[in-house]
Amino acid sequence: GTTGRSKGVMLSERNMCASLCTYGARAENWITSRLPEGQKLPLSHMTLLPLFHMACFVCVMSYPPAGWALNLCSDIRDFYRDLGLMHSDIMASAPMLVETVYNDFKRGRVSRLNGLWDLCCSSAALDPKMLLELAQNGFVINQCYGMTETFGDGILNFTQAEKHMSAVGKPDDHVQYKL
């Protein structure tokens, strides 16, 4: 994961491919209902995480088959340069990146984000007030938990409502949870 201690999780090819069906039509329907005015599919996706990280691997396996451009940024020091060169609608966002986007928004530097409007937040719980402020100002916030264990989003919170912004969310359709 991006915020906790490393953990060994056994994933099979079946685990890894099961989520691809979920990312197909269902995900496209979900994202289509949230597109900014004038935006059309396919979209483009930015990831800054290394290729060996599970979240990046999910992006590599999920978005190109749907026809999306996958923009890879290899170094945090090149983030703004790469985002400026490669328009990205959506970004897989570790907590530090979400805070960076929020700080740009607060400082009036949204133009640096080159049209980025959807943040797919993973791992740690973020400040719900910060997420709500982003959501109220045109950003779509997706909170995902359990990616390492499920090779997908695991538990999702797609709501943009204030009372649910701090909730973990609901299980994704492709996941079975056993305690």
Which sequence ranges carry the predicted segments?
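Glycine-rich, flexible loop segments associated with nucleotide phosphate handling
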Residues: G24-A25, L35-T47
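Hydrophobic transmembrane alpha-helices of multi-pass small-molecule transporters
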Residues: A18-T22, R26, T150
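Conserved adenylate-forming
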Residues: I31-L41, C59-L179
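Structural detector for helix-capping/boundary residues
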Residues: E13-R14, L49, V175
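Conserved AMP-binding
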Residues: P42-H53, M96
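Conserved AMP-binding A3 loop
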Residues: G1-C21, F158
